[in-house]
Design a protein with these regions (language model features):
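Conserved A3 ("GATE") glycine/threonine-rich loop of ANL adenylate-forming enzymes
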Residues: 198-215, 222-234
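A short, hydrophobic C-terminal helix/tail in secreted or cell-surface proteins
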Residues: 4, 235-237
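Nucleotide 5′-phosphate-binding alpha/beta core
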Residues: 1-55, 61-203, 212-216
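Charged/polar positions on well-ordered alpha helices
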Residues: 58-59, 237
Length: 237
C-alpha cells in the first residue's frame, strides 16, 4: 500500500538501510509468498497487482521457478530496455531504414495460472508480447496468435509461412531459438543466408542467454557486414 511505501521511504535512507531491511534471499525463502500470489493474494512482495508469473528454470528443490512480474517491471525494466537499445542503435546508425520493414519477434507461450481469473504464467517473452503496446503489432511479424503458439514445431512452420515473404528489417529473440527458426526458414526456402530472403535485414536484438556460443553459427546464416547484433533483452530474474 502507499502507506507502507511511505513508511519504507522514511526508514530506508541509504544503501545500508536498504540492505538491512531487504536482504538477499533465495527463491525457496520467498516461494511461500509467490504461492500465495499465484493463489490470488496481493500486496505481498510488491504494492501493485501481480497478474503475471514468468516461468524460469528450476532449482535444486523444484522443476520450475515462478517469478512475479509487475506492471512496473514490464514498463520500467523490460520495455524500457528495448527502447534504450533501439535508441542507441539509431544514434549509431543514423542512416538506418529500420522502420521501412517489420520486426520479427520470437517469443514463447503462456497459459492460465492455477485457474485464477485474469492471471497467467509463461515465458517472459510471451508476457512481453501479450502486454506490448498494440501499435507495435502493426510493425512486427508474425501475428500475435502465431507468436504465442504453444507447440514449438508447428509454431516454427507457422512463423516461416507468415514471414518468408515479409519485408523483415530486424529480429528480436533468444539466440538459441532464433537460430533454430532461421535454419528452418533457410531449409524451407533453399537459401544459404537470410539476406537472400530479407535483403533489408539490418539488426538482431538478442538476450536471455549469452550470444558468444552462437556467434560463429550466426555468421554462417547472416553474412552481410551491414547486419549488426545488440544485446538488450533481460532475463526473467
Amino acid at each position: 500500500s502507499s502507506a507502507a511505501s511511505d513508511v519504507y521511504k522514511r526508514q530506508i535512507r541509504n544503501y545500508e538501510d536498504f540492505k538491512n531491511r531487504l536482504p538477499i534471499q533465495t527463491y525457496e525463502e520467498v516461494k511461500p509468498y509467490v504461492e500465495r500470489l499465484r493463489a490470488g493474494e496481493q500486496n505481498l512482495l510488491w504494492p501493485s497487482e501481480i497478474r503475471w508469473f514468468a516461468k524460469s528454470s528450476g532449482t535444486t528443490n523444484d522443476k520450475s521457478k515462478f517469478l512475479p512480474v509487475s506492471k512496473e517491471a514490464l514498463e520500467d525494466i523490460h520495455y524500457r530496455g528495448g527502447k534504450d537499445a533501439a535508441a542507441i542503435y539509431f544514434r549509431m546508425n543514423p542512416e538506418s531504414r529500420f522502420f521501412s520493414g517489420k520486426g520479427l519477434i520470437l517469443g514463447g507461450s503462456h497459459a492460465p495460472n492455477l485457474n485464477t481469473n485474469h492471471s497467467l504464467v509463461g515465458d517472459l517473452s510471451a508476457i512481453l508480447i501479450e502486454n506490448i503496446n498494440p501499435l507495435v503489432n502493426f510493425v512486427r511479424v508474425p501475428s500475435k496468435q502465431t507468436a504465442l503458439m504453444e507447440h514449438f514445431e508447428p509454431k516454427m512452420e507457422a512463423i516461416a509461412r507468415e514471414t518468408i515473404h515479409a519485408n523483415v528489417s530486424n529480429l528480436s529473440g533468444v539466440p538459441s531459438w532464433m537460430l533454430v527458426l532461421i535454419k528452418h526458414i533457410l531449409e524451407k526456402t533453399g537459401k544459404q543466408s537470410l539476406e537472400e530472403i530479407w535483403p533489408n535485414l539490418e539488426v538482431l536484438f538478442h538476450g536471455g542467454v549469452a550470444f558468444t556460443p552462437y556467434r560463429e553459427q550466426y555468421k554462417d546464416v547472416i553474412r552481410s557486414s551491414k547486419t549488426v547484433s545488440y544485446t538488450h533483452l533481460r532475463a526473467h530474474e
